[in-house]
């Protein structure tokens, strides 16, 4: 039995086991790449939040252009503040648009790193699935090749009887 098992693993399932090993290695590599891109994305998000805070703070305090605004401009800023209070979603969209325009390099870098992270996460899932399928194929081939046909027939009849 052991020599038969050794010969089996040395020949027919070698391909399945090699594919399983290669898929596991690729899965690990893609996981590491996804993590590295996620780490690269975090500083970009932080820079975007800082820019958002600075722009929002400047507009709300009336020093949006580096100097104190005159009274008529303060009235406009106060009306904007009340608009922000009563329509927060629309105000957030506008502020985010200004932030993106002011900080476009970081936004592009963030989108690029996020896309890479998502691609590598998808590749990880694919390689993990491929690893599991190849492992199952190796096990199924081993069982099929090493179980006598009468045993297989008996187990098949037993399963049919239960169903």
Swiss-Prot record:
Domain of life: Bacteria
UniProt family annotation: Belongs to the UPF0416 family.
The protein's name in its UniProt record: UPF0416 protein RBE_1121
Organism: Rickettsia bellii (strain RML369-C)
């Amino acid at each position: 039995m052991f020599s038969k098992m050794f010969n089996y693993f040395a020949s027919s399932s070698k391909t399945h086991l090699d594919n399983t090993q290669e898929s596991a290695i690729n899965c690990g590599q893609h996981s590491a790449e996804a993590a590295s891109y996620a780490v690269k994305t975090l500083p970009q998000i932080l820079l975007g939040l800082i820019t958002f805070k600075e722009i929002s703070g400047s507009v709300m305090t009336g020093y949006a252009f580096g100097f104190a605004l005159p009274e008529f401009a303060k009235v406009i800023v106060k009306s904007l503040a009340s608009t922000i209070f009563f329509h927060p979603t629309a105000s957030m969209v506008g502020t985010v648009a200004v932030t993106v325009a002011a900080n476009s390099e970081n936004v592009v870098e963030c989108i690029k790193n996020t896309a890479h992270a998502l691609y590598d996460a998808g590749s990880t899932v694919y390689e993990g699935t491929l690893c599991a399928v190849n492992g199952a194929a190796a096990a199924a081939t081993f069982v099929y090749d090493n179980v006598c046909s009468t045993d297989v027939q008996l187990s098949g009849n037993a399963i049919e009887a239960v169903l």
